[in-house]
Regions:
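Nucleotide-sugar donor-binding loop of glycosyltransferases
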Residues: 140, 193-194
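Short beta-to-alpha loop/turn elements within the nucleotide-binding domains of ABC transporters
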Residues: 176-177, 188, 194
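Flexible, glycine/small-residue-enriched loop-and-beta-strand segment within the central core
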Residues: 48-49, 53-176, 205, 211-213
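Short, well-ordered amphipathic alpha-helices
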Residues: 109, 184-185
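Short secondary-structure boundary/capping segments
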Residues: 150, 190-191
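Solvent-exposed alpha-helix faces
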Residues: 129, 187-188
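Terminal amphipathic alpha-helical/low-complexity segments used for targeting or macromolecular assembly
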Residues: 1-46, 50-55, 59-61, 74, ...
Length: 220
């Protein structure tokens, strides 16, 4: 019997065990009250929470390994759906009300940085595949002003649909929308909203390179 099968067969016992591990002070720093971590499996992860009333919720069968989860704010949430895998993920929320949502059966492999600020949301749908050295950001972290002193670079949500395959070294910036059944080619920089499904996006800035496609995790 594999470790994962054993864990799945005894969810209450193993869930309690990982709850204890994830709250050990030498592993993690969870300050103030009202913060909750529940579900899933986290191994060799580091958690830093400095606000109040934050939630980290992992679905059944989900496994995070060698990840870093940071929340610097209050009323923030990280939701990972069932049967998903994240390895070497850096999930970062700053300011109040931010949300990072990853769907069911989505795999994130290799160093990936999800940065959420100013109460915005990063959402990744079901059955997705994310390669290494991927960056997703909802904002610029610093202000750009016009000559009247008004800020012109507000943060915006990022939406990634179901069944999206993101290649290596892709950057996805504020306001981007990637619809379902899309492949994002290696090195692409996505800066705007796309609505057409079944395409390959590539280039800087990203544009539609191919149409009427679908993809499969298996080498058929």
């Amino acid at each position: 019997m594999s470790i994962r099968t054993l864990i799945s067969s005894r969810p209450k016992l193993t869930g309690f065990g990982f709850w204890v591990i994830n709250h050990l002070p030498f592993n993690n720093s969870i300050r103030k009250k009202g913060n909750k971590i529940s579900g899933g499996i986290m191994t060799r992860c580091r958690i830093r929470i400095s606000g109040k009333n934050n939630r980290i919720v992992l679905g059944q069968g989900t496994w995070l390994k060698h990840c870093k989860l940071t929340i610097k704010g209050s009323n923030c949430s990280i939701f990972i759906g069932a049967d998903s895998v994240i390895r070497q993920g850096d999930l970062y929320i700053e300011d109040d009300g931010g949300r990072i949502v990853v769907g069911n059966r989505t795999a994130i492999y290799g160093p990936t940085h999800l940065a959420c600020i100013e109460g915005k949301t990063i959402s990744i749908g079901d059955d997705g595949l994310v390669s290494g050295n991927v960056t997703v950001r909802v904002g610029d972290s610093h202000s750009i002003l016009n000559l009247e002193g008004n800020r012109i670079n507000p943060s915006q949500d990022v939406q990634i649909g179901n069944r999206v395959w993101i290649g290596n070294q892709v950057t996805i910036l504020k306001g981007a929308r990637i619809p379902e059944d899309t492949v994002v080619a290696t090195g692409a920089i996505v800066t705007k909203q796309f609505s057409q499904t079944g395409t390959v996006l590539g280039g800087n800035p990203a544009k539609i390179m191919k149409e009427n496609i679908r993809w499969d995790k298996k080498r058929l």
